[in-house]
Design a protein with these regions (language model features):
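Surface beta-strand/loop "capping" patches
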Residues: 185-215, 312-317
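Extended acidic/polar, glycine-enriched regions
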Residues: 135-141, 210-310
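Accessory beta-strand-rich segments of carbohydrate-active enzymes
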Residues: 2, 39-45, 71-191, 214, ...
């Protein structure tokens, strides 16, 4: 495979890697980024190595060019990371503060050790986790060890588009630390979580603040238990420039102050003159939360996604703030040639989102991957709607059934039930339980982001099971968003959408009374831009001779989409945003250097 680089990968400052504050919805002043050079080693046995093989640039996976390693972690191996760090002024004997160690994501299972102590085990390659290391931390020369195991696509764990034997619509498998690692100093009792739910009809924002007392009641004294929580909301604003650290947010011009007696209780705060969030004016309300000695900055937006039938129409339409919005989306795999899952920089993420909007898209479907939280923050502040996929898992996919057979059944309008665990790769009970846990954690992680309009539970039958039960779980956890329960096929008749994929046939929809019609994947036309392809082999859904041919076929297909809108079509999603390895059907090339489809309306 030819190694391509984006401009951000070429210009990466390896001494300052992804240093922006990684959690925009709960920001604090006192933090330390641990990205940078770590020691690494591969082993066959689960035994900490005495010697390390070299240095790896965290948070880039060892399979990537930017990591400096360029080696695949195999299912029968372990990957070990090591680095030292200091905590100036830290004195654990005083017990006045805590040190939290955060990992944005580690693929797939890992164990964390601090100064020889095993402090955390975690499984789930797409979700963040933290560990309180106060008990074992010292002022200087702390040793941090992370041991990683990644079975990739050989097990039922979540894997997205990763495949050890990559090809076609599946891409190079990656492993290990792939999102930011960071430390945070907090008081003994600190703000653990902030939840926000806007209500534009009532003109209120509902906020719930949870403290560390909620999860550590035995070790918190009575005084800490009763600490009041103060919330100050700032006037709404537009943020064309990104916030990279909490000190950039002024606490002046506050709208409202509220005091809560205890944590874990919802409070309703009136917003008298609301500024609505939309794609043209994505207003954000920053607010400050104080709990004793702890202070955090967060934000929310006033907006509402809904399905409504408008006057003189018989179809349900997707609405934003009560107004019909045709969601013209693009499928985004979130891959980078030099760094796979990890965006090479904050600017790289911003480029993708801004160019999506320039192209004419007002929505992006994040496909089978959970991005770093800053990606969603940029969607919030720049004003683009997000459909978020749950990450697929399950055993080896039987493509003769879930891909080729399902395409034909969908065209023939023959329904297929989700009661065949062997055919749908969901025989393992442990895998089903793991999917449910990760689905819940995904909603909890991303639920505050105003840009997210819909949760996509299953894609094309990959690991699909108990679809109606999963839909009920999601609806209970988040009743304020839309649900695509089965994107593509294996529709079980629930959720908010009749969701079709159509790459090969004449475009059509099946209008329903209870659900909106969406074309959740279409297009996928392939064109190889000379000098900008990672592989010689080509994959896509219709091969174009040149850029002009691609543009012609795209516009013809887009015209077909537009003709379906009066018939009830509410959203469409073009495949895809960029080329990825063999799949050269992007609006942009893999290296983001050549636009293959010009902006359209």
């Amino acid at each position: 495979m030819k190694q391509l680089y984006t401009r951000w990968g070429k210009n990466l400052d390896r001494d300052h890697v992804l240093e922006e504050y990684p959690r925009p919805l709960l920001m604090r002043e006192d933090y330390q980024i641990l990205n940078g050079w770590w020691d690494y080693a591969f082993t066959i046995d689960y035994k900490q190595p005495q010697q390390y093989e070299g240095r790896i640039l965290v948070p880039f996976s060892p399979e990537t060019a930017l990591s400096g390693v360029g080696r695949q972690l195999k299912p029968d191996e372990y990957l070990w990371y090591r680095r030292n760090f200091d905590l100036p002024g830290w004195d654990r004997e005083k017990g006045q503060n805590r040190i939290l160690l955060h990992f944005g994501a580690v693929d797939q299972s890992c164990e964390v050790r601090i100064n020889g102590h095993k402090v955390k085990r975690h499984t789930g390659g797409y979700l963040p986790f933290e560990v309180d290391i106060s008990r074992y931390a010292q002022e200087s020369a702390n040793e941090l060890i992370v041991a990683v195991k990644d079975l990739s696509d050989t097990s039922y764990h979540s894997k997205g588009k990763q495949k050890l034997n990559a090809g076609g619509m599946f891409y190079t498998a990656q492993s290990g630390i792939w999102q930011t690692v960071w430390l945070e100093k907090v008081p003994e009792t600190y703000i653990k979580e902030i939840k926000t739910v806007p209500d534009i009809e009532k003109k209120i924002i509902r906020i719930k603040v949870s403290s560390s007392y909620s999860t550590d009641k035995k070790n918190v004294d009575k005084l800490s238990r009763n600490l009041p929580i103060e919330i100050k909301i700032r006037k709404p604003g537009l943020y064309p420039d990104p916030v990279v650290k909490p000190s950039q947010i002024s606490t002046e011009d506050m709208l409202e102050t509220a005091v809560l007696a205890v944590s874990d209780k919802w409070i309703e705060i009136p917003i008298e003159s609301i500024s609505l969030w939309n794609c043209e004016t994505p207003y954000l309300y920053y607010f400050e939360v104080k709990l004793g000695d702890d202070r955090a900055i967060s934000y929310f937006a006033m907006r509402k996604f809904s399905l409504e039938t408008k006057v003189h129409e018989e179809f349900l339409r997707i609405c934003l703030n009560g107004e019909v919005q045709f969601q013209n989306g693009v499928l985004d795999q979130g891959y980078w040639p030099e760094s796979l899952y990890t965006p090479p920089s904050d600017a790289a993420m911003i480029f993708d989102i801004q160019e999506m909007k320039k192209t004419g898209f007002n929505m992006v479907r994040k496909h089978l991957k959970i991005e770093p939280q800053r990606w969603y923050y940029h969607c919030d502040r720049l004003g683009i709607v997000v459909w978020q996929d749950m990450v697929n898992g399950g055993s080896y996919y039987k493509h003769w059934f879930v891909t080729y057979g399902a395409t034909l059944l969908s065209w023939l309008r023959i329904p297929m039930r989700d009661v065949y665990p062997r055919l749908l790769s969901r025989e393992a009970k442990a895998g089903r339980l793991e999917f449910i846990r990760e689905m819940k954690e995904t909603i909890r992680l991303l639920g505050n982001h105003p840009s997210i309009a819909a949760w996509v539970i299953f894609n094309e039958g990959w690991g699909q099971f108990q679809t109606e039960d999963m839909t009920r779980i999601v609806r209970r956890l988040d009743p304020n968003r839309l649900i695509d329960q089965a994107s593509g096929w294996f529709d079980q008749g629930g959720g908010d959408f009749s969701s079709l994929h159509n790459y090969f046939f004449k475009l059509f929809i099946r209008p329903e009374r209870e659900r909106a019609s969406v074309l959740s994947e279409f297009g996928g036309y392939s064109y190889r831009e000379p000098g900008h392809c990672a592989k010689e082999k080509l994959y896509g859904y219709g091969i174009c001779k040149n850029k002009k041919d691609l543009e012609k076929r795209f516009l013809e297909r887009w015209s077909g989409v537009r003709n379906l809108i009066p018939q009830g079509l509410s959203a469409s999603i073009y495949t895809q945003w960029t080329d990825v390895e063999e799949e050269v059907n992007g609006v942009f090339t893999y290296d983001r250097e050549v636009r293959k489809i010009e902006p359209f309306q």
